[in-house]
From Swiss-Prot:
It catalyses: tRNA(Gly) + glycine + ATP = glycyl-tRNA(Gly) + AMP + diphosphate. Disulfide bonds: none annotated. The gene is glyS. It is found in: Cytoplasm. This is Glycine--tRNA ligase beta subunit. The keyword Membrane does not apply.
Length: 701
């Protein structure tokens, strides 16, 4: 057994490319070794901006032998009556490269046939691996790649060297004009000389560490966090937590060195988000806060190298930030010269979408939709504030600050609203209507912000789909999936019992002046299908797919209600008696469907002949009122517990009663009994879609 080590050294790879490339390397090498029949131990990747490396421990010295069996014609066609090979047999043997005497008889699902077993002897690992590694590096995919000057080889950035070692012995691997060897290189400035490697992962990591390269991202992250903690103390505070920035900086440096810098205190008069955004998004600096979380006029930059005089690096970082903050202060002061209300009409000169009009049109429609949603929820008292918040929600798009810092849209509008003395709830709604930005981000804080946020997303979703634009495959240029997920997260989190169909119709009302690409009814159905698809995708990440399908089939117009039904059903499925319950109710639903699905649920007690059907009616009458009351209260766990008490009576009914009796009166009566049972659970879930079996003892009984 020997360790395989493979490193690709390159010019600086963009930070966002490195994590994905390392995952690809690890997954692809493990699969390639398995496909090549080379046994191995741990496969792991490490990397920095200048190198991507992967290793496999304990690689077998040779491939395992491969046995393959090829089947030919039926025996009856392969041999004549005297047992001599026919042309069919000799032709098959020739096609397989063997003598006809090597053919054997084999039983197959298609009868007895002639066959040949071939053994491919395994080759030595060093014969197999060079081509395997060339495919590995050539198969790496990046969002953008550069082509070699001399051939068709591509990579994220020009490849400068490669290392390919098996048990310390070099393998010859080519990519473009680069051929692998056994030397790597340390830090570009601190240790640029060639480093000879022995070929083990531990030797590789140790030698690079001495050459100022922490190749393992886990080790480098620990070093980065330690540097940030040290620098925070030096700055008389602590570094503001920012996991996303840590992850980004992690792949910008090979050995992190933190540098503390300072900016003018007067810049703390700017909104904190402006200063933080300038530092993190434009310069990759970490903000420093005091013990109460307030921003200090200090920052921490992470350098990719060490300089003899740290003051030189510090002054460079400070100079760049000073200029950027001066620009921010200028935009802030200029923006404050005009009130938000004075900027509303400016939105009319800013296009939202060519077929949907201006941002002013958008703001007015958002207000109309938000007001309709509020009335549907019985929150009429919010309408005036909703209209005001909707008018102002997009106004900051025309400010200099948002032009310079697009990521602060909403945030700046809220700051300006507070500075102008507008109602705090309005200011919060301006900021919150962009939330949630991502699938796990925070939600709006109030009904005001939540309703404007939902209305904004509904307008985009219905409007964009309405004019014929859609999300297809991985492409979603208008963020429709994100909008749909945002709607669902807000509605469920705030417990809004909204009809999605009605909300879509209200949005179409607001879009009445827009020319739709299809009929209104078709657009509405397309939007609802899109929303249902997002519901299904989101819920199947947490719940069993069959339960999700069962609940959605029973109705998903009110997603809050559907989510509660799903949670109750998931809890019920975890109980040992659920299989019997699901099977019994599935039979009820199937019989109802076969009988036509509709019809009277009336039951005439005088027509009940068997004890089992009488017992079932008695059990029904005992629980029906309780189920109705529990269902009205949306207490679905209680509904399921109560309905579950019917399972023994339903099981006895099916064991002893023929529902589809020849007597029409008996048949109709028994179908009516089934419909009454189905009425208790049919609006909870379609049990026919649930994958469940009765326990073995129940089936045996």
């Amino acid at each position: 057994m020997a360790d395989l080590l493979f490193e690709i050294g390159a010019e600086e790879i963009p930070a966002g490319f490195v994590p994905g490339a390392l995952r690809q390397l690890e997954d692809d090498l493990a699969k390639a070794l398995a496909d090549a029949r080379l046994a191995h131990g741990e496969v792991r990747s490490v990397g920095t901006p200048r190198r991507l490396a992967v290793w496999a421990r304990d690689v077998a010295p040779k491939q395992t032998d491969a046995r393959t069996e090829a089947f030919g014609p039926p025996v009856a066609q392969a041999y004549d009556a005297e047992g001599k090979p026919t042309p069919a047999a000799t032709g098959f043997a020739r096609s397989q490269g063997v003598e006809v005497s090597a053919l054997v008889r084999a039983q197959t699902p298609k009868g007895e046939r002639v066959a040949v077993t071939k053994v491919e002897k395994g080759r030595r690992a060093e014969q197999v691996l060079p081509a395997l590694l060339e495919r590995l590096v050539g198969g790496l995919r990046f969002r953008k790649a550069m082509r070699s000057r001399f051939d068709e080889a591509t990579f994220a950035r020009p490849v400068r060297w490669m290392v390919a070692l098996l048990g310390g012995r070099p393998l010859k691997v080519r990519h473009g004009e680069v051929t692998s060897g056994k030397v790597t290189y340390g830090h570009r400035f601190l240790a640029p000389k060639a480093i000879a490697l022995k070929g083990t992962p531990d030797d590789y990591l140790a030698k690079l560490r001495r050459a100022h390269v922490l190749a393992d991202p886990v080790e480098r992250r620990a070093a980065l966090l330690a540097e940030l903690a040290r620098a925070g103390k030096e700055a008389a505070g602590k570094v503001r937590e920012d996991p996303a920035l840590v992850e980004q900086v992690l792949y910008l440096v090979e050995e992190p060195t933190a540098v503390v810098g300072e900016f003018e205190k007067s810049n703390l008069e700017l909104p904190p988000e402006v200063v933080i955004s300038e530092m993190r998004n434009h310069q990759r600096y970490f903000a420093v806060v005091d013990g109460k979380g307030r921003l200090k006029n200090r920052f921490v930059a992470v350098s990719a190298t060490r300089v003899k005089d740290p003051a030189v690096a510090r002054h460079g970082y400070e100079r760049v930030l000073r200029a950027r903050l001066a620009d921010a202060r200028f935009f802030f002061e200029e923006d404050r010269k005009r009130k938000l209300h004075e900027r509303i009409e400016d939105l009319g000169r800013r296009t939202f979408q060519a077929k949907l009009g201006s941002e002013l049109d958008r703001a007015q429609r958002i207000g109309a939709v938000a007001s309709a949603l509020a009335r549907a929820l019985g929150k009429d008292a919010l309408v005036a504030d909703l209209l005001e918040a909707s008018r102002l929600a997009k106004v900051d798009l025309n400010t200099g600050m948002v032009g310079e810092f697009p990521e602060l849209q909403g945030t700046m509008g809220a700051h300006y609203a507070r500075l102008e003395g507008l109602k705090p709830e309005i200011a919060d709604a301006i900021e919150d209507h962009y939330k949630p930005i991502g699938a796990a981000e925070e939600l709006p804080r109030s009904d005001l912000g939540a309703l404007v946020a939902v209305a904004d997303r509904l307008h985009s979703l219905v409007g964009i789909i309405g004019v014929g634009e859609k999300a297809t495959g991985a492409a979603d240029p208008f963020g429709l999936r994100r909008a749909a997920i945002g709607i669902l997260r807000i509605v469920i989190a705030r417990g809004y019992h909204l009809s999605l169909a009605a909300a879509v119709e209200q949005t179409l009302d607001a879009l009445s002046g827009v020319k739709l690409a299809a009929g209104r009814a078709l657009v509405a159905e397309q939007v609802l299908d899109f929303l249902r698809g997002r519901v299904r995708a989101a819920w199947t990440e947490r719940f069993d797919a069959d339960l999700v399908e069962a609940v959605l089939a029973a109705g998903s117009d009110d997603v809050v209600d559907a989510r509660r039904r799903l949670e109750a059903l998931a809890d019920a499925k975890a109980r040992p008696d659920f299989g019997s319950l699901a099977v019994a109710f599935k039979r009820v639903a199937n019989i109802q469907e076969k009988a036509g699905g509709s019809g009277a649920a009336a039951v005439d007690p005088a027509l009940l002949r068997d004890a089992a059907e009488k017992d079932l009616l008695a059990a029904l009458e005992k629980v029906e009122q309780e189920v109705v009351a529990r269902r009205a209260a949306r207490d679905y766990p209680a509904v399921l517990r109560t309905v579950a008490t019917l399972e023994p009576a339903v099981a006895r009914f099916f064991d002893g009663v023929l529902v589809m009796a020849e007597d029409p009166a008996l048949r109709a009566n028994r179908l009516g009994l089934m419909r009454r049972v189905a009425a208790l659970f049919s609006d909870l879930a379609d049990f026919r879609k649930i994958q469940a079996e009765a326990p073995a003892q129940a089936r045996a009984g």
